[in-house]
A protein has these predicted regions:
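Conserved loop->alpha-helix
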Residues: 1-196
């Protein structure tokens, strides 16, 4: 479980593509403190298990589905990624509850700069509209955000200067892809009793 408060921006050291199981290596410092093999770390919002740790580089194994259904398959050496360690029992939840299971990948359609913030407009992937509501929670690349506007086939979020500085969202451009995880509470409420 995560809460969408990015602890560190890491750097992709390598993405070794293999037939069924690819290996991602990420360079970081802060999130490695106290981290051991088997721990979960969200990489751009995707929950991955640490399989190896050396100095300032940690390694993950990724199934083909992870590469195909998230933006991680588009990563290249030197790319920046948002990192967050799993929540600790008794810790604060400053964002919202997130599982690290990505619902879809969306594309940034527009980036508008205002005096004190920026608005990102994201193309809404099919089937997610019912989970995206104004003032509701959504995660983009592992960053907990509040939905600003919802329109036909798109939604917007607002980025304050701090969020732009401490996450990769500050450097995203029109046309870039982002991992989307909708609010887990909305999923449970809307799906309650469907198959019971």
């Amino acid at each position: 479980m995560f809460n969408g408060i990015v602890e560190e921006v890491g750097i992709v050291d390598a993405l070794e593509r293999r037939k069924n199981l690819s290996v991602l290596k990420v360079r970081a410092r802060k999130v490695l403190q106290g981290t051991k093999r088997g721990d979960s770390i969200a990489v751009d919002g995707v929950c991955l298990t640490v399989t190896d740790k050396k100095k300032d580089v940690f390694t993950y194994d990724m199934m083909r589905e992870t590469l195909e259904k998230t933006s991680l398959g588009r990563l290249r050496r030197g790319d920046q990624v948002n990192l967050e360690r799993a929540l600790k029992a008794g810790g604060r939840v400053s964002g919202h509850f997130m599982t690290g299971h990505i619902d879809a990948v969306g594309r940034i359609e527009q980036r508008m700069t205002e005096a004190n913030y920026e608005e990102l407009s994201i193309r809404l992937p099919k089937g997610l509209g019912k989970y995206i509501v104004p003032k509701g929670s959504v995660a983009l690349d592992g960053v907990s955000l509040t939905v600003g506007k919802v329109g036909k086939g798109r939604f917007s979020v607002y980025l304050i200067p701090f969020t732009k500085q401490v996450t990769t969202l500050g450097s995203k451009k029109k046309g870039d892809w982002v991992n989307i995880e909708t609010d887990i509470l909305a999923k449970y409420v809307l799906n309650r009793g469907k198959d019971a």
